[in-house]
C-alpha cells in the first residue's frame, strides 16, 4: 500500500491494518519454514509495510 493512502487512514484503521499485516507476516514465515513460499520477497515487503504503519502511528500521537 502506498504511503499516500496510509496517511489518509485514521489511527484506528492503521491499527487494524497493522494487525492484518502481523497475521500476514506470520503466515509468510510459516510458509518459508515449510518450504512452500514461492515469492521470498513477500517477507521483506510485509516487514517494510509494518514499519511504514508503525511510523505513521508514532507520528500521529
Curated annotation (Swiss-Prot):
| MF-aspect GO terms | structural constituent of ribosome
User: Which keywords does the record carry?
Assistant: Ribonucleoprotein, Ribosomal protein
Which Pfam family is one of this chain's hits?
A: Ribosomal_L29
An annotated GO cellular component of this protein is: cytosolic large ribosomal subunit
UniProt xrefs under SUPFAM superfamilies: Ribosomal protein L29 (L29p)
Query: Where is the signal peptide, in residue numbers?
Result: none
Please report any disulfide bonds recorded for this protein chain, giving both cysteine positions: none
- BP term (GO), one: translation
Look up the domain of life of the source: Bacteria
Q: Which InterPro entries match?
A: Ribosomal_protein_uL29, Ribosomal_uL29, Ribosomal_uL29_CS, Ribosomal_uL29_sf
Family as reported in the entry's similarity comment: Belongs to the universal ribosomal protein uL29 family.
Spell out the PANTHER family in the cross-references: 60S RIBOSOMAL PROTEIN L35/50S RIBOSOMAL PROTEIN L29, LARGE RIBOSOMAL SUBUNIT PROTEIN UL29C
Q: What is the name of this protein?
A: Large ribosomal subunit protein uL29
Which organism's genome codes for this protein?
Stenotrophomonas maltophilia (strain R551-3)
Amino acid at each position: 500500500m502506498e504511503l499516500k493512502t496510509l496517511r489518509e487512514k485514521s489511527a484506528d484503521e492503521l491499527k487494524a491494518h497493522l494487525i492484518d499485516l502481523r497475521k500476514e507476516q506470520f503466515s509468510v514465515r510459516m510458509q518459508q519454514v515449510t518450504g512452500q513460499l514461492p515469492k521470498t520477497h513477500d517477507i521483506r515487503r510485509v516487514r517494510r509495510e509494518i514499519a511504514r504503519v508503525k511510523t505513521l502511528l508514532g507520528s500521529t500521537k
